[in-house]
Amino acid sequence: SAHGRTGSRAGYYHFDFQTKEAIAFIESVIKEPVHLIGWSDGGIISLLIALARPDLVRSIISIGTNFHWDVGLPFDEEPTIELTEEDRAKFAQRSPDPAHMQEEIIRKAYAIWRKEPNMTKADLATITCPVLVLCGDDEPFSNHHTIDLFESLPNAQLAIVPGTSHAVVKERPETVQSIIKKFNDDLKTNDAFPITKMPRLRKEKQELLLAPQDEVE
C-alpha cells in the first residue's frame, strides 16, 4: 500500500486494484499457491485474495486487520498531514512519483479507508484456508470487530498481544515472531488446526478429525 517502488497508476490504492495486482504477481512470478502475511491494508488484501482466488492461497497471517470500513476508524474528512524531512527523503528515494504525490497518496488513502473494505461475515465464512488473526489489544478499531473477524473464519486462530497497538509488529517483535513461527510450524499438522481440550468454535471439526477413519467414511 504505497510503500513500494512502483509509480501511481489509475485506480491506485483501491483494495480491488491492489488485490488484482497481488494476484497477477502470484500468477506471473511465484506461479504456485502461497502463504500470505499482511499487516493492516496488507491483511485486508490477503483476505480479498483468498475470496477472489482461493486456489492461490495456502494460509494467511492477518495482522491489525479490519474487514469492513464502518468500525469507527478515526479518519477525518480532511486529515492534517504533517511530513517530516525524513518522510520526504524516504519517499524521494523509493518512489518514482514526483514529490507532490506523497501528500496526494496519503489523502487518497484516507478517502478510501472511509469507504473500503466492504467484506461481510458471510464472505469471511467462505475462506477455508488456515488464518491467524493477530493484533494489538488497542487497535484503531474495536476488539469486538477483531473477534467478529476471527469467529467468522472457519479455520482461524486468534492472538491479541497485550500492551500493544496497531504497531504491534514493532512494539513486541519477539512475541509476534514467536506466534507466527508457531502457526507456521503447525501448518505441517492438520493445516494448523489446533486440537484442544475444551473446544467450542472448533468442536465439530475437531471431532471429525479425531474420529476413527472407518466412522468418517
What label would you give each PLM region?
Residues 162-217:
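Catalytic active-site module of serine/aspartate enzymes centered on a nucleophile-bearing elbow/loop
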Residues 6, 40, 64:
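Catalytic nucleophile serine of serine hydrolases
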Residues 140-145:
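Conserved alpha/beta-hydrolase "acid-adjacent" motif
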Residues 146, 150-167:
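Catalytic histidine neighborhood in serine/cysteine hydrolases
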Residues 44-52, 56-90, 199-201:
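Flexible "cap/lid" loop of the alpha/beta hydrolase fold
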Residues 107-123, 137:
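Active-site nucleophile elbow and catalytic-triad environment of alpha/beta-hydrolase enzymes
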Residues 1-37:
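Active-site loop/oxyanion-hole signature of alpha/beta-hydrolase fold enzymes
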Residues 126-127, 133-135:
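Short beta-strand/loop motif that positions the catalytic acidic residue
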